[in-house]
Design a protein with these regions (language model features):
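ATP-binding/phosphotransfer module of carbohydrate and carboxylate kinases, centering on a glycine-rich
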Residues: 1-53, 169-333
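Short glycine-aspartate micro-motif
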Residues: 2-6, 54-58, 93-95, 119, ...
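Short, acidic Gly/Pro/Ser/Thr-rich loop/turn segments
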Residues: 12, 64-66, 135-139, 194, ...
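Active-site nucleophile and cofactor-binding loops and adjacent substrate-binding regions
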Residues: 34, 74-76, 93-100, 119-122, ...
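Short beta-strand-loop/turn "lid" adjacent to the catalytic site in phosphate-handling enzymes
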Residues: 48-94, 99, 103-112, 129, ...
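Short coil/turn connectors at secondary-structure junctions
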Residues: 54, 89-90, 123-127, 136, ...
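ATP-dependent carbohydrate kinase catalytic cores
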Residues: 66, 91-122, 216-245, 250
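Glycine-rich phosphate-binding loop of actin/hexokinase-like ATP-binding domains
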Residues: 114-184, 189, 276-278, 284-297
């Protein structure tokens, strides 16, 4: 049995898999709020109760990983492969969550994707993965024989680059608050809430009472804003989502240029699949608006990842590899 985990800033997912004929077969799964636990051990201790056939474990974590240890950017506890191995007595791997997602792409089927731009995939070209949720994750997908090999990064924390006068004002506002302003400050769930407050101030329009109530009830403006934008019930919410999608597309284009991702760009995370009508409307135009390289970017395929099990599947695949070489103490794929 293989233990796979996806540890994000909001949710912690665990699953048990078996490998049959080279294919991963899921046997059991659970999802928890990450904040419920002080350590990863607290989470998988109950989940694994009575399970005595474990062969290996692998976890994707939202944050940088060094020497098998992750200090999650939006996760309160650290995760160490050596500690997991000592605890469970099996090979253990800890990797960045975007790396896990990158490995998981090969486990998906065509129905797990929504095509934003069909383009012309270069069979020898690199790819790129960008994922917006609680944070903004980015990975480069190096092309090797047999598919992509993901290289994790923390590109979401690179400096935000405004494209027009309004976004310069946005940068000024956020710089007063945070000092350094990263792309994650504007392209993420918390970033969506930030953009909404900026757009509300910019518009000069008062917030409708019904919207104030819904935001207070939800405790988070982001899902309320996206729902109102989809329903076209508030113009400021619509402008907020338009800017969010445009910024998301712009940074995806930046990543595509850095990776020379002629093999395709994959858009992950929870925000894009839940807002597909809005993403279809403005993502590609911002993605390809790169001056002299607009033609190159226009030929790059773009797909939204619809399957939220991608990271778990990637972790399970790496766990299967670790189980096949048990003599090693696994800390990286």
């Amino acid at each position: 049995m293989l233990l796979a985990g996806d540890v994000g800033g909001t949710n912690l997912r665990l699953a048990l898999f078996e490998e049959e004929g080279g294919k991963l077969v899921e046997r059991r799964r659970a999802r928890f709020a990450t904040r419920e636990f002080a350590t990863l051990h607290d989470a998988f201790d109950g989940f694994l109760a009575g399970e005595r056939r474990l062969e290996a474990a692998a976890f994707g974590v939202a944050g940088p990983v060094r020497h098998g240890r992750a200090e999650g950017t939006n996760v309160a506890f650290s995760i160490d492969a050596a500690e997991i191995r000592a605890d469970l007595g099996v090979p253990a791997v800890v990797m960045n969550d975007l790396e896990a997602n990158g490995w998981g792409l090969a486990e998906l089927t065509p129905s797990d994707f929504e095509v934003l731009n069909r383009g012309e995939a270069d069979p020898l070209g690199n790819g790129a993965l960008i994922s917006a949720g609680t944070g903004l994750g980015e990975a480069i997908l190096f092309r090797e024989a047999g598919g992509f090999v993901p290289m994790p990064s923390e590109g979401g924390h690179a400096s935000f680059a405004p494209r027009n006068d309004e976004e310069i004002e946005l940068l000024k506002t956020l710089r007063l608050r945070h000092g350094h302003v990263s792309w994650e400050r504007v392209v993420s769930g918390p970033g969506l809430s930030t953009l909404y407050r900026f757009e509300r101030t910019l518009s000069g329009l008062p917030e409708p009472e019904w919207l104030t109530r819904e935001v207070a009830s939800a405790g988070d403006a982001a899902p309320v804003v996206s729902r109102a934008a989809l329903a076209e019930t508030d113009p400021v919410c619509q402008r907020t989502m338009h800017r969010f999608v445009s910024l998301f597309g712009a940074e995806a284009g930046n990543l595509a240029l850095k990776a020379l991702a002629t093999g395709g760009v994959f858009v992950g995370g929870g925000i894009a699949p839940r807002n597909l009508p809005l993403v279809r409307d403005g993502f590609f135009s911002a993605f390809s608006a790169k001056g002299r390289f607009a033609t190159l970017l226009a030929r790059i395929p773009i797909k939204v990842v619809l399957n939220d099990s991608c990271a778990i599947l990637g972790a399970a695949r790496i766990a299967a590899r670790a189980a096949a070489r048990p003599a090693r103490t696994e800390v990286t794929p």
